[in-house]
Amino acid sequence: MRRAEIERETKETYVKIALNLDGEGSFLGDFPIPYYKHLISTLCFYAGWDVEINAKGDIEVDPHHLIEDTGITLGKAFNSAILKSSFLRFSNKVIPMDEALVMVVVDISGRPYLEIKDDKEILKGRLIKEFLRGFVNNSQMTLHIWILSGENLHHVEEAIFKALGLALGEASKEVSNLKSTKGKIW
């Protein structure tokens, strides 16, 4: 079973995540920021992951700490679970949501890198970047996001999480042989 349970506790936050990569796309638990609960549950639904989360933090100060630490914890859980099998590794998805159009490309490579092409600076100053950076660095994957069009911030961010979920669901599929010219990822 490709499962992991990771707990992270700091003076600012507490995050515990149980992840099953071979699930049904269910999201259970408590996340005190409704918009980000919506985005994270969307990611898990489209990836086909079962996730149980318990998170709390000093959101009265700023939600930044909890959002970033949730990305870190989910990334660590993903990394721990994915290493229990061989997997497809690469995927890309282009997803529309009304006027928004987003392309996501992933490589579960063992080399963390995040690139967001956002010519209109739609995501400037948005905490979604902190979540994604924490997730990418701790899952040790390469993630490229291109915002091809969009005006409504909610549509753009939701399209990102849908595309990311679909791409990760495909890239994390079990295969008999992991493809790498090096012979291994990590």
From Swiss-Prot:
Pathway: Amino-acid biosynthesis; L-histidine biosynthesis; L-histidine from 5-phospho-alpha-D-ribose 1-diphosphate: step 6/9. The keyword Cytoplasm applies. It holds the Pfam family IGPD. Gene3D superfamilies: Imidazole glycerol phosphate dehydratase, domain 1 (3.30.230.40). GO terms for cellular component: cytoplasm. GO terms for biological process: L-histidine biosynthetic process. Its main location: cytoplasm. InterPro entries: IGPD_sf, ImidazoleglycerolP_deHydtase, ImidazoleglycerP_deHydtase_CS, Ribosomal_Su5_D2-typ_SF. Its EC number is 4.2.1.19. It is found in: Cytoplasm. It catalyses: D-erythro-1-(imidazol-4-yl)glycerol 3-phosphate = 3-(imidazol-4-yl)-2-oxopropyl phosphate + H2O. Keywords: Amino-acid biosynthesis, Cytoplasm, Histidine biosynthesis, Lyase. One of its GO terms (molecular function) is imidazoleglycerol-phosphate dehydratase activity. NCBIfam families: PRK00951.2-4 (NF002114). HAMAP family: HisB. Belongs to the imidazoleglycerol-phosphate dehydratase family. This is Imidazoleglycerol-phosphate dehydratase. It comes from Dictyoglomus thermophilum (strain ATCC 35947 / DSM 3960 / H-6-12). The gene is hisB.
